[in-house]
């Protein structure tokens, strides 16, 4: 069930679903696994907000366990394609593709709430079929793994060798550890939230 927000205006009351209301404030909320439908919705929202105002920042709030690599890369590429900066905020959990998208925010504008958790790892996949089919899938997952690791190395400032080691298995970080790692730029505390409001 999606919450509804009722607003008073000179012409009476208007009801919005919460996500539409947030979008008016240039806030996109990723609160589920990344799928094709989710990615298409987020890409459309990013493009819409760019068309509305190409100079004003967009805020992507993330509470996601990850999801489809290909769909996540579509969001990532769109974030880097559009003119407005995309500020990212981790609220709860940014794992796997969620962490990748968190790191994809504009430099200096990647943040997390204090008690959030961030997790990076290598892409997961499975293959079945004939030997040649399995070989094709294995080559693709190795390509994706290398691509994701190179992007994370660039976004964090960590050496590629460290990213490769750390993503070999689930690698969890606190918000402050993610700052030290270079995945985000700062931890937002209650005082900072009030100062920006």
Swiss-Prot record:
Molecular function (Gene Ontology), one example: ATP-dependent peptidase activity
Presence of keyword Cytoplasm: yes
InterPro entries given in the database record: ClpP (IPR001907), ClpP/crotonase-like_dom_sf (IPR029045), ClpP/TepA (IPR023562), ClpP_His_AS (IPR033135), ClpP_Ser_AS (IPR018215)
Main location: cytoplasm
Function: Cleaves peptides in various proteins in a process that requires ATP hydrolysis. Has a chymotrypsin-like activity. Plays a major role in the degradation of misfolded proteins.
HAMAP family named among the record's database cross-references: ClpP
Family: Belongs to the peptidase S14 family.
Xref: PANTHER family: ATP-DEPENDENT CLP PROTEASE PROTEOLYTIC SUBUNIT
Descriptive protein name: ATP-dependent Clp protease proteolytic subunit 1
Origin species: Synechococcus elongatus (strain ATCC 33912 / PCC 7942 / FACHB-805)
């Amino acid at each position: 069930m999606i919450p509804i927000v009722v607003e008073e205006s000179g012409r009476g009351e208007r009801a919005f679903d919460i996500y539409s209301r947030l979008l008016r404030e240039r806030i996109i909320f990723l609160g589920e696994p990344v799928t094709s439908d989710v990615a298409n919705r987020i890409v459309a929202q990013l493009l819409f907000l760019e068309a509305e105002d190409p100079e004003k920042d967009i805020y992507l709030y993330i509470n996601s366990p990850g999801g489809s690599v290909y769909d996540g890369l579509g969001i990532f590429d769109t974030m880097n394609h559009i003119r407005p900066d995309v500020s990212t905020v981790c609220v709860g959990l940014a794992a796997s593709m969620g962490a990748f998208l968190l790191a994809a925010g504009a430099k200096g504008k990647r943040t997390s709430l204090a008690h959030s958790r961030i997790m990076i790892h290598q892409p997961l996949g499975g293959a079945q079929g004939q030997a040649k089919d399995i070989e094709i899938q294995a080559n693709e997952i190795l390509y994706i793994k290398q691509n994701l690791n190179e992007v994370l190395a660039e976004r964090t400032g960590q050496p590629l060798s460290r990213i490769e080691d750390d993503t070999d298995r689930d690698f969890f970080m606190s918000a402050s550890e993610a700052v030290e790692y270079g995945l985000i730029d700062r931890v937002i505390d209650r005082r900072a939230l009030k100062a920006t409001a």
